[in-house]
UniProtKB/Swiss-Prot annotation:
Role description: Promotes colloidosmotic lysis by binding to the midgut epithelial cells of insects. Active on various scarabaeid beetles.
Identification of the protein by name: Pesticidal crystal protein Cry8Ba
Sequence similarity: Belongs to the delta endotoxin family.
Keyword Nuclease: no
Regions of compositional bias (Polar residues) in chain numbering: 15-25
GO MF: signaling receptor binding; toxin activity
Keyword rRNA processing on entry: no
Length: 1169
């Protein structure tokens, strides 16, 4: 580079800005003497070297072949990137014309032969003459036939309805496809797969493009649907086959070049770079030829990095190269090649300059290290990374690359030479000069920055990056047609070998730096272009199918975020290309969305570094997303929803949607949903179809466009109405749409349950169940139940209770026959989006909401959190007398619980057979044995209870109480009645049990006895069943429940109880008191009349009575407090006294002197003796 050109550039550090020190070691390495350099003065040597500058080593012819191969491949990739997904004959013809011109140029040497020579030189392996000649001959034939096909395609384009043009293009297509099928094996000859690899890749690319035409034009050519499908399936099969072959043999060739020396690394990296450009970049585009997946223009991006050769002088005559004494292969690989990382771009550079000198007239200032500044897509944060050394510097140089693409660099790798003494020389390799050619990303203006600290008397070699990464051939200047931009700069540094060599990393220009989503095109954003990655998320290297690195998410917390710009208002779908070793769920959040997607396992039993083409699949977010035009950044986060071993994200795709497309999609979805309801004969419902699914299908039909599809909508509505009729007809539940809760037939429910009209989750009416009610210290569950009578059931048949839960906490669901089935549902309220979609008028868009609900339901798993439920229940032998039927019930026992549910149905699933029938028959036998025991137990307790009740009466009509009946007889009978089991259902006490009738019969008779007893006792409320009613008491007196008996408690000596009541004059009465005294002192019950005639009964603790122990059976339900034993201590006594009076009023007073006084009953009854 001439210093006379400095006025054209911005020169940085043409002279040192600071001067710190020279290198401390002047001659770290002295070379062994050579014949050429012994006794030679350095000035003579410099003169000898002058004029022999060679930019690149090796044969010029070979280098030109390599450059031509790379340039042709870059041109092809550029043409392919601009023509992806364009399904029109004009652009396709134009693309084919350009590809043919590149691959079969009108020059003497074959481009295919250049491809062969390129790889031969890279791996130092010649293709056998027979294989080369055969391949070149067949490629020539393919070129001729491709031209004929292109001609036929152009003629058909001009005359699409002409029979000859149509026949010719179809024939030429079939012939060319047959030739590719026949000739492709010639491009992968055994033992020559690697040197043939570029040829194979380019031929495979042409074949796949050809097969794509069958999908694009096949219908217009008159091909049958099955023929088109066959071509499409072949294209998909060959895409995988060709891709896997290319990647496999690329990796094989690269692995063979691994070595131990720096020179071997140079060869290794050159193979990696050039084969990425000629093979992997082409393979990465194969997936985009799938017209069913990519029917529109598609923007694809290549995010892989390639590294140009390290910037050190090489092959200096009689001196050598920088890599002759340099770090090892593995050290250079580690230092120069970045590990997989989030895609970034360079924004600034600080170069650290050191000086190596021999004399004041012979020295080199060189690039000794640097700090690079870079950003991730869409972020404002700047990251920095240090390379090389920043110690003992001469100067620092700062470069600002903000908003610029560096499309080219010119660098000087130099050597500084000194003859230490005759026969010994000292050489130092460094990089003293670089020019950065830049173009502004915003306004296309150009600028050049130069790093050039002063050096003197050095031998330099110019390195032009465009010779390794040429621009596309477009007729435009290179600042417009450049193919790559500088992305990063690494460094090979070793103080021990005195190695200071920068390495430039480049990214393809197709990698957009803003993640702009274009309107009207499918925009692909590679996973590596995420702005941030979360915990348990990392970047892994792609194998070549993907054009760049991948994002790997693991466990529940793995996540990544993308930042994008939408310059125009758009409507689109989101699709993800991925690979995973298990089936699970991911969540999407952003763009006013929050949803979950289920993904299926795509591979197993292999490492993520061994993935093949078919290990990658697609999942699609079902909702159409709308965004408004904005220059602001929009965010989309993707995370793992469940514990997942590995989810590998290749790319996200934004697929534009117009109203017609969305309407067509809605119609197809509605058709699919409605058809799925019916059997093949369309005269019945599919066995597994639920009432909720019928309603959801109806919602989809309602959302169809009346303008575009009026007839289809009408017909689908007729079908879904029939499905609803069939669903209702098979449902054995009464009042399934909750018209009358607690009516004569149907549902019985607790208070507080609401009936809600339909919404986006429920089309029809549904119920909202509140939590259990708390009143004082008691908790009253919320319940809902219904009985299906025995008469509508079939023997030995399985039925199923089904329904849908919008959300719930602690909802218990039961089916009850001879046994009880119970499930508990805790269902999250996650079916509706956080931000409701709205129409242009601001109202909620119910159809969009409905799609969101459907998408959520498609990915939910079958667990306690699932919204749908299904409980089987089997019938055996029917007993119409017992009429057990089937009870269905819902209950919430937690005050904090809640539930919304609807679409309840009990349907017949089918007759039992096989193991299920055998199992039920065994259970039925066990049930009969159990029922026999229950009946025996019932008979015993019922007879004891009935006898106790019979003894209460003096007649058979239960009209007169036995005169000797005391309150203890009544309570004893009551306890026996309460001990009768199976009166109510164990889970729902409101549901009658097998002994409900007997229990009710005895309870009614006992209630009659209590009534007669109350009539007989002249003292109102003498048994305290009505608490303190009728009694005058002081504040400390209370009534307690002891042994299921109401007991009056006088706790202190200063408390009193009294009552005035009416009696019949001149009638003899007996005062009978049942009480006990605790502690010291006495308890008194006194009675007097208007004439102050009185009687007193005295109770003390010494009235101990061993008969004071009671055996009570207090429950009438299974498992509730049965056979409990109570003891009242120290004594319970019953004392009587006779009294009569001429007055019609009497007074009774109760008191005590100390301790506590318990009174169970005070009776004043007519003395019948």
């Amino acid at each position: 580079m001439s210093p006379n050109n400095q006025n054209e550039y911005e020169i940085i550090d043409a002279t040192p800005s600071t001067s710190v020190s020279n290198d401390s070691n002047r001659y770290p390495f002295a070379n062994e003497p050579t014949n050429a350099l012994q006794n030679m003065d350095y000035k003579d040597y410099l003169k000898m070297s002058a004029g022999n500058v060679s930019e690149y080593p090796g044969s010029p012819e070979v280098f030109l072949s390599e450059q031509d191969a790379v340039k042709a491949a870059i041109d092809i990739v550029g043409k392919l990137l601009t023509g992806l997904g364009v399904p029109f004959v004009g652009p396709i013809v134009s693309l084919y014309t350009q590809l043919i011109d590149i691959l079969w140029p009108s020059k003497q040497k074959s481009q295919w032969e250049i491809f062969m020579e390129q790889v031969e030189e890279l791996i130092n392996q010649k293709i056998a003459e027979y294989a080369r000649n055969k391949a070149l001959s067949e490629l020539e034939g393919l070129g001729n036939n491709y031209q004929l096909y292109l001609t036929a395609l152009e003629e058909w384009k001009e005359n699409p309805n002409g029979s000859r043009a149509l026949r010719d293009v179809r024939n030429r297509f079939e012939i060319l496809d047959s030739l590719f099928t026949q000739y492709m094996p010639s491009f992968r000859v055994t033992n020559f797969e690697v040197p043939f690899l570029t040829v194979y890749t380019m031929a495979a690319n042409l074949h796949l493009l050809l097969l794509r035409d069958a999908s694009i034009f096949g219908e217009e050519w008159g091909l049958s649907t099955s023929t088109i499908n066959n071509y499409y399936n072949r294209q998909m099969k060959l895409t995988a086959e060709y891709s896997d072959h290319c990647v496999k043999w690329y990796e094989t060739g690269l692995a063979k070049l691994k070595g131990s020396s720096a020179k071997q690394w140079i060869d290794y990296n050159q193979f990696r770079r050039e084969m990425t450009l000629t093979v992997l970049d082409v393979v990465a585009l194969f997936s985009n030829y799938d017209t069913r997946t990519y029917p529109l223009a598609t923007t694809a991006q290549l995010t892989r990095e390639v590294y140009t050769d390290p910037l050190g002088a090489v092959d200096v005559p009689n001196i050598g190269s920088w890599y002759d004494k340099a770090p090892s292969f593995s050290e250079i690989e580690k230092a120069a090649i970045r590990p997989p990382h989030v895609f970034d771009y360079i924004t600034g550079l600080t170069v650290y300059t050191k000086k190596r000198s021999f004399t004041s007239d012979r020295y080199m200032r060189y690039w000794a290290g640097h700090q690079i500044s870079y950003k991730h897509i869409g972020t404002s944060s700047t990251f920095t990374q240090m390379y090389g050394t920043n110690q003992n510097l001469q100067s620092t140089s700062n470069f600002d690359f903000t908003n610029y693409d560096i499309y080219k660099t010119l660098s000087n790798g130099a050597v500084l030479l000194d003859i230490v003494y005759p026969g010994y020389t000292y050489t130092f390799f460094g990089m003293p000069e670089t020019e950065f050619f830049m173009v502004n990303q915003l306004n296309n203006t150009r600028k050049t920055l130069t790093y050039k600290p002063a050096s003197k008397d050095i031998i330099d070699r110019t390195r032009d990056s465009e010779l390794e990464l040429p621009p596309e051939t477009s007729g435009q200047p290179n600042y417009e047609s450049y193919s790559h931009r500088l992305g990063h700069i690494t460094f090979i540094y070793s103080s021990s070998t005195s190695t200071y060599v920068p390495v430039f990393s480049w990214t393809h220009r197709s990698a957009d730096l803003t993640n702009t989503v274009k309107s009207g095109e499918i925009t692909q954003i590679p996973g590596g272009k995420s702005s941030t990655i979360g915990r348990n998320t990392y970047i892994i290297k792609g194998r070549g199918y993907t054009g760049g690195d991948l994002v790997a998410l693991t466990d529940r917390i793995g996540s990544c975020e993308f930042q994008m710009i939408f310059p125009e208002s758009q409507r689109f779908r989101i699709r993800i290309r991925y690979a995973s070793n298990e089936t699970s769920y991911i969540s999407l959040y952003g763009l006013n969305q929050s949803g979950t997607l289920k993904f299926n396992q795509t591979y197993s039993n292999k490492n993520e570094n061994d993935l093949t083409y078919n290990d990658f699949k697609y999942i699609e977010y079902p909702r159409v997303i709308s965004v408004n035009a904005s220059s602001n950044i929009q965010r989309l986060s993707i995370g793992i929803q469940t514990n997942t071993n590995l989810f590998i994200l290749d790319r996200i795709e934004f697929i534009p949607v117009d109203e017609t497309y969305e309407a067509e999609t809605d119609l197809e979805a509605a058709k699919k949903a409605v058809n799925a309801l019916f059997t093949n004969t369309k005269d019945g419902l599919q066995p597994g179809v639920t009432d909720y699914e019928v309603n959801q299908a109806a919602n989809l039909v309602e959302c169809l466009s009346d303008d575009l599809y009026p007839n289809e909508k009408r017909l689908l509505f007729d079908a879904v109405r029939e499905a609803k009729r069939l669903s209702e007809a098979r449902n054995l539940l009464q009042d399934p749409d909750f018209q009358e809760i607690n009516g004569e037939n149907g549902w019985t429910a607790s208070t507080g349950i609401e009936v809600i009209e339909g919404d986006a989750v429920f089309k029809g009416r549904y119920l909202r169940l509140p939590g259990a009610r708390e009143i004082d210290t008691e908790t009253y569950p919320t319940y809902l139940y219904q009985k299906v009578e025995e008469g509508v059931l079939k023997p030995y048949t399985r039925y199923r209770l089904r329904g849908f839960v919008g959300s719930s906490q602690g909802l218990e669901i039961y089916t009850i026959r001879h046994q009880t089935n119970r499930i508990v549902k805790n269902v999250p309220d996650d079916l509706l989006p956080d931000v409701p979609p709205v129409n242009n008028d601001g109202r909620i868009n119910r159809c969009s909401e409905q799609k969101y609900v459907n998408s959520r339901l498609e990915v939910e798993n079958r667990s306690g959190e699932a919204h749908e439920f299904s409980i089987p229940i089997d019938t055996g032998e029917l007993d119409y007398n017992e009429n057990a039927g089937i009870w269905v019930g819902f209950k919430i026992t937690d005050p904090e619980g809640y539930a919304t549910l609807g679409n309840l149905e009990l349907v017949e699933e089918g007759p039992l057979s096989g193991d299920a029938l055998e199992r039920l028959q065994k259970e039925e036998q066990q049930w009969k044995i159990q029922m026999t025991r229950r009946r025996e137990e019932t008979d015993r307790r019922y007879m004891a209870s009935k006898q106790a009740v019979d003894r209460l009466y003096a007649d058979y009509q239960d009209q007169q109480l036995n005169p000797n009946v005391e309150i203890t007889d009544l309570t004893a009978a009551q306890d026996l009645i309460q001990s009768i089991p199976y009166v109510y259902n164990e889970m729902f006490p409101e549901i009658p049990g097998m002994n409900y009738t007997k229990f009710t019969e005895l309870t009614d008779r006992l209630q009659q006895a209590w009534g007669l007893y109350d009539q007989r006792n002249a003292i109102p409320n003498g048994d305290y069943r009505n608490e303190l009613s009728n009694w005058n008491t002081t504040s400390g007196v209370n009534v307690q429940q002891i042994n299921h008996t109401s007991v009056l408690v006088i706790p202190n000596w200063n408390e009193q109880v009294s009552q005035k009541f009416t009696v019949q004059p001149n009638q003899r009465y007996v005062l009978r008191v049942t009480a006990r005294k605790e502690g010291v002192g006495n308890g008194y019950v006194s009675i007097r009349d208007g004439g102050n005639q009185s009687e007193t009964l005295t109770f003390s603790a010494s009235d101990y009575d061993t008969n004071g122990m009671y055996d009570t059976q207090a429950s009438n339900t299974n498992g509730y407090n049965t056979n409990s034993v109570y003891m009242i201590k120290p004594a319970i006594s019953r004392k009587t006294v006779d009294i009569s009076s001429v007055y019609n009023q009497m007074w009774i007073e109760i008191s005590e002197t100390e301790g506590t006084f318990y009174i169970e009953s005070v009776e004043l009854i007519v003395d019948v003796e």
